[in-house]
Amino acid sequence: MTEGELLQLSKTGDPDITEDDYLAIISAKTAALISAACRIGAILGSLPEEKENALAMFGKKVGMAFQMADDILDYMADEGELGKRLGKDLKEGKITLPLIYLLKKANPREKDEVRKIIQDGFKKSGLMKILRLFKKYNIIKISLMKADHLIANAKAELSLFPDSPAKNALFRIADYSLSRSK
């Protein structure tokens, strides 16, 4: 997790961060923690290595989707409900998946405006401009689709396991990571 934090710090305020950079950051943070927890459960249950690895990959993908959902919530959740200020990541210079997608989809003039907002630091007017562009380019939906795809892949990792209450519980946890509002 420390590696992920350091990588994120090195990319703070960098509008040229790629989707691969972002995925590497979230893989080394929340996803690493959830993956380790799932792997430990398999080890303690004396499961074969194939199932241990499947559970670890399930945890990694759920952790990545959870972080994506958290990053998306930063731009859409009610501040009172979420418990943190709208646009907090932007204010801290964190370039997350929605901004990466916006920088891919926006026209050249809009890209320049977004880069300026990122480089100049947080201003409420900048956040409002970004939120308008998110709406114009359907960025929240596109970002949620990426997270949803990860959840589907995470569930597929558990195909080695027979249907059971435990497997269903893991599926519910995976689904919750996207449906939460806090």
Task: List where the protein language model places each region.
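All-alpha prenyltransferase/terpene-synthase fold signal
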Residues: M1-K182
